[in-house]
Amino acid sequence: MDHRLLEIIACPVCNGKLWYNQEKQELICKLDNLAFPLRDGIPVLLETEARVLTADESKS
């Protein structure tokens, strides 16, 4: 994931900052507790494709 891209893109729900989770290949919105998948290195920034973070994931 290109870190320059992270400076440009935002959460499609709240327009907040996204954080990259390399291990899970997801972009995380801490404000909405959502994780957006990366497929073949391409962010899928659709609310319908996002998963809700677990309580443990939200804390970290």
UniProtKB/Swiss-Prot annotation:
Pfam families: Trm112p. It comes from Escherichia coli O139:H28 (strain E24377A / ETEC). The gene is ycaR. Coiled coil: none annotated. Gene3D superfamilies: 2.20.25.10. InterPro entries: Trm112-like. Belongs to the UPF0434 family. This is UPF0434 protein YcaR. GO terms for cellular component: cytosol.
